[in-house]
């Protein structure tokens, strides 16, 4: 057989294949939107949820694709009226070879401006979970999509309250761009899935978890066994930056999360602005490490059950309501406050460990270098709204007082050594109204 003849047969074969594809697609190409109702019915049967499609079209650049405009999937009746997902436009690129066998295989998906709203019911299920197919054929399973791209997306997660009323949003991400590989669309909606359902990269202009905000976030992301895992996270937050990992688990009656974060250059005053009860309570620049985890409860305060540990340092700040330097000097009966006169509440350096357990912070080793006063201590503070303080330790004051003042201070319980007066102290009351005393009990400082 000559080369020319083989070439001719090859061209004829290709032409025949294209003809078969054309016959299969011709009705769709002439008016794709006429199949919109059938596609909606199919998707509703497959997902068990109400589906909306504004318009269907076929495009040829950069490849053969179905374009879906104004796509929406509504939450099931168990949930308040809402959408699970709304997408302005979806471009689904098809595998032409599979069409020869009358099979529809999606090679890639591009989602323009998707809004994803995930809601958990107190009894356990999420609004996106698939209750199971309802007598629909399995000739077109979504399966694994090789590539999924998200452009300008938004995601929110929230819980319903025990009354089934809408609860607060505990996680949200805005201006999302993401590229994912090998996304198992069927498994994501399957509550029994244990597979790796996709992985890739993610960028977000703004991410908020509880009251904590991060901007210009970049991370790797993995969807696996009902979990979303963010790794190699880098973000800007409160004038500084943060790195670490975050995972959110969506299985079980309550969702749960775990984070391991490292922070540097955080503006404490800006950070506390997110917490109404803590605004204006402290300033300074903070750095440190935190590991926090917990269940996300179906309540108006879904993150109140958190627990964790870490170590923080804050430099060049103050705690206005405590007036720590001045109050401790008065407690020692010092009339000349020295540097504390001009900086009654300021400090050079604070270093502390911490353990968080249901809105109470416990610190075993606290080191504070103030102006004229240094102290070592330990104690607890409540974050539940009472702001209750319970701290104790030993304060050390550089002694530049006269003989009589030093004598009175020593008689009051202090110890003078190397021109430094040290004495035990206790701080009770609240952050706004602290009560200073010697030891565990003593005279209140006015």
Residue ranges of predicted features:
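Terminal hydrophobic membrane-targeting helix
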Residues: 19-121
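Small-residue helix/turn framework positions
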Residues: 63-86, 105-123, 146-161, 167-184, ...
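Intrinsic-disorder/low-complexity linker and hinge segments
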Residues: 130-141
């Amino acid at each position: 057989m000559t080369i020319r003849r083989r070439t001719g047969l090859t061209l004829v074969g290709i032409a025949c294949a294209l003809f078969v594809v054309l016959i299969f697609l011709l009705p769709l190409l002439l008016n794709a939107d006429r199949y919109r109702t059938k596609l909606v019915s199919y998707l509703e049967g497959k997902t068990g949820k109400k589906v909306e499609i504004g318009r269907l079209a076929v495009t040829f650049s950069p490849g053969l694709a179905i374009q879906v405009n104004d796509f929406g999937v509504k939450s099931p009746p168990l949930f308040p009226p809402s959408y699970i997902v709304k997408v302005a436009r979806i471009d689904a690129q098809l595998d032409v070879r599979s069409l020869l066998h009358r099979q529809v295989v999606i090679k890639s998906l591009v989602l323009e401006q998707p809004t994803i709203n995930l809601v958990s019911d107190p009894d356990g299920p999420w609004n996106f979970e698939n209750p199971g197919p309802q007598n629909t054929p399995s000739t077109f399973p979504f399966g694994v999509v090789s590539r999924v791209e998200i452009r300008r997306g938004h995601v929110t997660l929230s819980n319903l309250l025990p009354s089934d009323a809408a609860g607060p949003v505990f996680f949200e991400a805005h201006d999302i761009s993401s590229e994912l590989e090998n996304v198992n669309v069927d498994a994501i909606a399957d509550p029994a899935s244990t597979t790796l359902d996709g992985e890739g990269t993610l960028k977000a202009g703004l991410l908020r978890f509880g009251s904590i905000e991060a901007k210009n976030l970049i991370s790797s992301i993995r969807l696996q066994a009902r979990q979303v895992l963010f790794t190699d996270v880098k973000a800007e937050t409160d004038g500084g930056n943060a790195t670490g990992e975050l995972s959110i688990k969506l299985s079980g009656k309550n969702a749960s999360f775990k984070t391991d974060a490292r922070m540097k250059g955080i503006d404490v005053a800006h950070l506390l602005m997110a917490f109404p009860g803590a605004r204006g309570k402290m300033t300074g620049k903070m750095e440190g490490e935190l590991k926090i985890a917990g269940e996300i409860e179906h309540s108006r305060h879904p993150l109140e059950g958190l627990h964790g540990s870490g170590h923080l340092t804050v430099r060049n700040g103050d705690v206005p309501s405590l007036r720590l330097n001045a109050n401790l000097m008065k407690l020692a009966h010092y009339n000349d406050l020295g540097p504390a006169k001009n900086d009654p509440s300021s400090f050079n350096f604070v270093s502390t460990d911490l353990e968080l357990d249901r809105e109470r912070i416990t610190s075993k080793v606290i080191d504070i270098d103030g102006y004229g006063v240094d102290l070592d201590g330990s104690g607890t503070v409540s974050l539940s709204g009472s702001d209750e303080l319970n701290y104790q330790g030993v304060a050390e004051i550089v002694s530049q007082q006269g003989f009589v003042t030093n004598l009175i201070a020593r008689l009051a319980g202090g110890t003078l050594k190397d021109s430094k007066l040290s004495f035990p102290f206790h701080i009770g009351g609240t952050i706004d109204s602290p009560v200073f005393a010697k030891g565990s009990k003593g005279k209140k400082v006015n």
